Amino acid sequence: MRSSAASDVYKRQGYTYDGVVVPQIQYLGSNAVALRDDGFTIYSGRQIPKELKTVQVEQEIISTFYDEDNIGLVFKNDSKDKQYTMQVYSSAGKLKFSKDFNIPYTTIRMSDDYIVMYNSSQLCVLNSNGSEKYFGSVDGTVKDFFKLGWNKYLLVMDTGVNVIKLS
């Protein structure tokens, strides 16, 4: 059982966001990012985290992805030509780019400063500025994608492995 004084300290150290769901918290270097249903909040500090930046969005977030330097959000797009909109932010919360796209992905993630999207038959790789570096069909299910060397990546699939050179 907590004492009244301990309970007061506990209440003052936390953050309360009414009507907001925070399904995921990730540590990016020395900061923590709370991925919220309406955006994200960046915190700094280990003992008593300090709120550094909050980014709120109006659209419903359907996917998130991140690495130590980037935080990405994906929304449904109302356009008939492009199904989705991607927004990528720096780890300081500054918008780097926004991009509409039409790849029916099942997985989206960051890998060595690239954004990797894939489904059972397609793979798309974007750089951290949103420029497309690779798009193609694949035979098999993508299991992993990681860097081998300068612009060379290993695509691991259920049917085998392929080396891809990005342009």
Positions of predicted regions on the chain:
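Single conserved hydrophobic/aromatic residue that forms the stacking wall/gate
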Residues: 1-6, 10
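Structural motif
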Residues: 4, 38-44, 80-87, 123-125, ...
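Short loop/turn segments that connect beta-strands within beta-propeller blades
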Residues: 8, 45-48, 90-92, 127-130, ...
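A short beta-strand motif characteristic of beta-propeller blades
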Residues: 11-17, 49-55, 93-99, 131-136
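Repeated scaffold domains used in trafficking and secretory/extracellular systems
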Residues: 18-30, 57-68, 101-112, 140-150
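Residue-level marker for isolated small/hydroxyl-bearing positions within beta-strands
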Residues: 35, 74-76, 118, 155-158
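Blade-level signature of beta-propeller repeat domains, shared across WD40, Kelch, NHL, RCC1
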Residues: 142-167
